[in-house]
Curated annotation (Swiss-Prot):
<feature type="binding site">
    <location>
        <begin position="127"/>
        <end position="129"/>
    </location>
    <ligand>
        <name>FMN</name>
    </ligand>
</feature>
<dbReference type="GO" id="GO:0008652">
    <property type="term" value="P:amino acid biosynthetic process"/>
</dbReference>
<dbReference type="GO" id="GO:0005829">
    <property type="term" value="C:cytosol"/>
</dbReference>
<comment type="similarity">
    <text>Belongs to the chorismate synthase family.</text>
</comment>
<feature type="binding site">
    <location>
        <position position="41"/>
    </location>
    <ligand>
        <name>NADP(+)</name>
    </ligand>
</feature>
<keyword id="KW-0285">Flavoprotein</keyword>
<dbReference type="InterPro" id="IPR000453">
    <property type="entry name" value="Chorismate_synth"/>
</dbReference>
<keyword id="KW-0057">Aromatic amino acid biosynthesis</keyword>
<dbReference type="Pfam" id="PF01264">
    <property type="entry name" value="Chorismate_synt"/>
</dbReference>
<dbReference type="GO" id="GO:0010181">
    <property type="term" value="F:FMN binding"/>
</dbReference>
<keyword id="KW-0274">FAD</keyword>
<dbReference type="InterPro" id="IPR020541">
    <property type="entry name" value="Chorismate_synthase_CS"/>
</dbReference>
<dbReference type="GO" id="GO:0009073">
    <property type="term" value="P:aromatic amino acid family biosynthetic process"/>
</dbReference>
<keyword id="KW-0028">Amino-acid biosynthesis</keyword>
<feature type="binding site">
    <location>
        <begin position="247"/>
        <end position="248"/>
    </location>
    <ligand>
        <name>FMN</name>
    </ligand>
</feature>
<feature type="binding site">
    <location>
        <position position="332"/>
    </location>
    <ligand>
        <name>FMN</name>
    </ligand>
</feature>
<keyword id="KW-0456">Lyase</keyword>
Amino acid sequence: MTLRYLTAGESHGPALVAIAEGFPAGLPVDFEAVDRDLRRRQKGYGRGGRMKIETDAAQFLAGLRGGVTTGAPIALAVWNKDHENWKDLVSPYARGGRKFTQVRPGHADLAGALKYGLDDARDVLERASARSTAVIVALGALAKALLSSQGVEVCSRVVAIGPRDIRPDAPPTPAQRDAIEASDLHVDDEALAAEWRALIDAEKARGGSIGGAFDVYATGLPIGLGSHVHPDRRLDARLAGALCGVQAIRAVEIGDGTQVGRPGYEFHDAIHHDPARGFWRETNRAGGLEGGMTDGMPLRVRAYMKPIPTMLHPLATVDLATRAATQARYERSDVCAVPAAAVVGEAVVAWELANALLEKFGGDTVEDVRRAVEAYAARIR
C-alpha cells in the first residue's frame, strides 16, 4: 500500500488534525524528532507574533504502540494555543465577531468567498492559512523516519531572500547542516544572512514583505523511484505539485532546470560505471531526476516563495459586502517566512519520496521494505 493522508483544522481553531495511512509496521517514531521539526517550522528571522504564542507539539492518537507503527492508520493532532484568544470568533458551534470583507490581494479570500457563496472571507482564510502546514510538517517527519530507515536523508537550505541569491550545486555537508540549523535564516553563510536580515528589516520598516527561495535535498536514493510511463507517475511532476501545494510557493526548479541557455553538453550529466560504485555521475545538473525517475544522484529541488501578501501597508482592494473600493484588511502575519517554508518543503518532498519508495518496494513491515531495497540494489549494480 502507498501513503495517503487527510488533514483538517483552521488557523485559529482548536487543533490541526491528520490521519495517515500506509506506513508499514515496525517503524520506530522519535517523538522528539517530530516536535523538533515543528519547532524548526516556527523559527526564522522575520516571523510574526503568532510564533511567540504557539509551542507546537504533535499528539499521536492512533497507529502506534510504544513508539512503533503498527500498520494501522496513524492519527495525530497539533493543538492551537491561540484558539483561546479566538474562540468567540472561530468556533464550530457559533458565529460571531466582525465579518472579514476587505479581501486581500494575493490570498484565497476573494476567490474562495465567491466560489462558496460566503459573505465572510474568514471561512476561507482560516483554512487557507499557512498555519495548516504545522500538521504537514508532523506528517513529513514520519515520512523522513521511513526514508531514514532505508538510508535516505532529507534536508534543506535557504538560497535566496529578495534579489540576493546563491546557487549551491551539492547537498550541505554535516558541518554545513549544523550551521544551517543554527542560523535564523537557515543558511550556512553568516555574511549572507546579515545581508538578508537588512533586506527583511527594510521591508518591515515600510510595512511590506519579502520572499525568496530554498533548496530541498535528498541523499541515498536508489535509482528508479518514480516512472516514465505516465505523466502523473513522474516523480518530478509529483514533487513539483507537492511543493506548489505549499502556501505562497509560485515556482519549482529541478536541478539546474532554469539554466536552459546552456548547450546540451553543459546541461546533461555523463554516465559512468565501476564495479564498486555501480552507476555514477561526475555532475548533477539534473538534480537527481531523469525521465521522471531518480537516477541515483542526490535530489536537488528549488522552490520559489512569493512575498507574503498580508502587509501593514496594504494594497487596494474591494469590499466583498459593498463592492466599494477600500484597503485590504491587515491580519497578523510575517514579514518573511522563507526559512519556515524550507522546513515545510522538506516535509512534502519527504512524503512524496516515501510514497515512491513504497510504490517501488512495497512491504507490510519495515523489514520487508529493507530486504526489497537490498535485493534491488544488488540486481542493478
